[in-house]
Curated annotation (Swiss-Prot):
GO terms for molecular function: ATP binding; magnesium ion binding; methionine adenosyltransferase activity. This is S-adenosylmethionine synthase. Pathway: Amino-acid biosynthesis; S-adenosyl-L-methionine biosynthesis; S-adenosyl-L-methionine from L-methionine: step 1/1. It is found in: Cytoplasm. Belongs to the AdoMet synthase family. Its main location: cytoplasm. Homotetramer; dimer of dimers. ATP binds at residues 16, 165-167, 241, 247-248, 264, 268. It catalyses: L-methionine + ATP + H2O = S-adenosyl-L-methionine + phosphate + diphosphate. K(+) binds at residue 44. The keyword Coiled coil does not apply. NCBIfam families: metK. The gene is metK. One of its GO terms (biological process) is one-carbon metabolic process.
Length: 406
């Protein structure tokens, strides 16, 4: 039985100030990792009225036109004019990038890649549930889809009065079996042009966004709708609020349904276990649930800086396991190598896939094949193919099921 009769999660659009910062940080990471797979990247961004500040520690042999990159990200989101609150063409870009500390580097780098130490101490969680096809909790899954739909309508000109900044929040009702059965409340706030009538806005948002995203059987007569509940939302983006990398860690993960170790993802290369171990945790948990070993699974993994082997691995299936949690831990250790370098190899993480993750959730996305081209120092071009969102694969579920004897 689920602990909650009601549960709420929220999401924000790609035009939310904090998400602008996340996307810039991950665009910098992508640009570098496409050229230098040995790079160390920890990139933080702040955006506020008329300025984007990029700071952090980066050690790389690659060169990136950071100012041009920042402007392209901002423009691609839709901030192309001061009329909408931010202009990627004219904003100031301040570069405060330094190099990684030699003290950190000596704890991470090893002559044998498999002995690579964790980039920091910390604890990370992975989670999966069978309540949706994406193996994600319904509140966060559909909250993401609402703001994703808002961006789709805006970018395709179907609701041309929409602007980039938006937030969603969903309260789901759960039944006695712990399954989502209805939406109790919908909150959707979207930035808009000043000349749109609020009644028209609410009608169109309800019809074209909410009812297009949420299954009809979950929208009942008692569902409450709060669409732009404060009225006008003309001023948004970095004018309305300062945006910072790493400020939406619950939006990025499981919407509060699972625990969080506290480390943000964006702007960090895979040597940072804050990111790579959280991805591995999702991979493990999703395969455990897909294998039918449990209906819900949360895994915790922890590390010490400079040490390759995790300091702990634990599993909680919340009473839904078909075998004991201790047995699942044994299977996890047998089928998944959770040392930092092994995670990078297992999930093939040294590719420019990270800006894709920086809006609408790092988890619950469909993995897909894509490619990119890079040029070496001799001027030769190379094409590499990789899987985006590789931690969403369920390719180890069969092996886990067989090993569990199910």
């Amino acid at each position: 039985m689920n602990e909650y009769s009601l549960f709420t999660s929220e999401s924000v659009s790609e035009g939310h100030p904090d998400k602008i910062a996340d996307q810039i940080s991950d665009a910098v990471l992508d640009a570098i990792i496409a050229r230098d797979k040995q790079a160390r990247v920890a990139c933080e961004t702040m955006v506020k009225t008329g300025v984007a500040i990029v700071a952090g520690e980066i050690t790389t042999s690659a060169w990136v036109d950071l100012e041009d990159l920042v402007r392209r990200v901002i423009n691609d989101i839709g901030y192309t004019s001061s009329d909408v609150g931010f202009d990627g063409n004219t904003c100031g870009v301040l570069n405060l990038i330094g190099k990684q500390s030699v003290d950190i580097a000596q704890g991470v780098d090893r002559s044998k890649p498999e002995d690579q130490g964790a980039g920091d101490q910390g604890l990370m969680f992975g989670y999966a549930t069978n309540e949706t096809d994406s193996y994600m909790p319904a509140p966060i899954h559909y909250s993401h889809r609402l703001v994703e739909r808002q961006a789709e309508l805006r970018k395709h000109g179907l609701l041309p009065w929409l602007r980039p900044d938006a937030k969603s929040q969903l309260t789901f009702r759960y039944d006695a079996q712990g399954k989502p059965c209805a939406v109790d409340a919908v909150v959707l706030s979207t930035q808009h042009d000043p000349d749109i009538d609020q009644d028209e806005l609410r009608e169109m948002v309800k019809r074209e966004i909410i009812e297009e995203v949420i299954p009809a059987e979950w929208l009942t007569e008692t569902t409450k709708y709060h669409i732009n509940p404060t009225g006008n939302f003309v001023i948004g983006g970095p004018v309305g609020d300062c945006g910072l990398t790493g400020r939406k860690i619950i939006v990025d993960t499981y919407g509060g349904m699972a625990r969080h170790g506290g480390g943000a993802f964006s702007g960090k290369d895979p040597s940072k276990v804050d990111r790579s171990a959280a991805y591995a945790g999702r991979y493990v948990a999703k395969n455990v649930v897909a294998a039918g070993l449990a209906e819900r699974c949360e895994i915790q993994v922890s590390y010490a800086i400079g040490v390759a082997e995790p300091t702990s691995v634990s599993v909680d299936t919340f009473g839904t396991g078909k075998i004991s949690d201790a047995k699942i831990v044994e299977l996890v250790r047998e089928h998944f190598d959770l040392r930092p370098n092994a995670i990078t190899r297992m999930l093939d993480l040294l590719h420019p896939m990270y800006q894709l993750t920086a809006a609408y959730g790092h988890f619950g996305r469909e993995p897909f094949e894509t490619s990119y081209t890079w040029t070496d120092v001799g001027g030769k071009q190379h094409v590499e193919t990789f899987t985006a969102f590789p931690w969403e694969k369920t390719d180890r579920a069969d092996a886990l099921r067989q090993a569990a004897g199910l």
